[in-house]
């Protein structure tokens, strides 16, 4: 499955996908001081509630408007999921034309929402 994470200023939304099917989704309050271990423990608990484990997650990606949490999520993925977690941001190819004066100023949250609608 694919784990997708959208870290917002107040809430973090994430879900698991199998192909085009959304398997499960969750959200919790964004805590800026969260560590990779805390994120891993929270994810593990939520996966287990739905009969899933870390081994079921084969890929992941994160979008974050909270810069200090990006390394925590990527570290969590390496430590607990066993793979690198790409971060959506400037330079990530989306397959969608971005027609604004300075694409590097486009927030990751708006980018992923636009791609989802595209």
Per-region residue spans from a language model:
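Short beta-strand-loop/turn "lid" adjacent to the catalytic site in phosphate-handling enzymes
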Residues: 50-105
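A polyampholytic, Gly/Pro-enriched intrinsically disordered region
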Residues: 102-115
């Amino acid at each position: 499955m694919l784990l997708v994470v959208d870290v917002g200023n107040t809430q973090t939304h994430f879900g698991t996908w199998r192909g085009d099917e959304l398997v499960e989704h969750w959200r919790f309050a964004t805590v800026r001081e969260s560590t990779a271990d805390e994120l891993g423990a929270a994810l593990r608990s939520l996966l287990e509630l739905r009969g899933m484990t870390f081994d079921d997650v084969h890929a992941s990606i994160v979008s974050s408007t909270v810069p200090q949490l990006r390394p925590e999520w990527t570290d969590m993925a390496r430590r607990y999921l066993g793979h690198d977690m790409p971060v959506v941001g400037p330079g990530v190819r989306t397959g969608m034309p971005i027609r604004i004066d300075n694409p590097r100023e486009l927030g990751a949250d708006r980018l992923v929402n636009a791609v989802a609608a595209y």
